[in-house]
Amino acid sequence: TDLRAFARLGEEGVDLFMTDSTNAEVPGFTALEKDIGPVLENLFGHAERRIIVASFSSHVHRVQQVLNAASAHGRKVALVGRSMVRNMKIAADLGYLDVPKGVL
């Protein structure tokens, strides 16, 4: 974290800067978002049986990646959980989620 950059923001008049990140307190690095899609594609292409993916119900981009990988390999996706189903319906209705025909 570039603490000097945060200090400069304060000097420029920013009174409050808030951010949140899952596992921010855990040392090390996580994979970049752009790296996840190819991993899912590989997994969906090579797994011989059922694949179970867990995700936050607010992570529309991750669900899109799963839908794309499933579609590319002729697999089906089942959304489980009231929040997941509701959020993905809203995302699809607003055009933020493209559900390939026959995948859900």
Predicted regions and their residues:
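His/Asp/Glu-rich metal-coordinating catalytic cores
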Residues: T1-L104
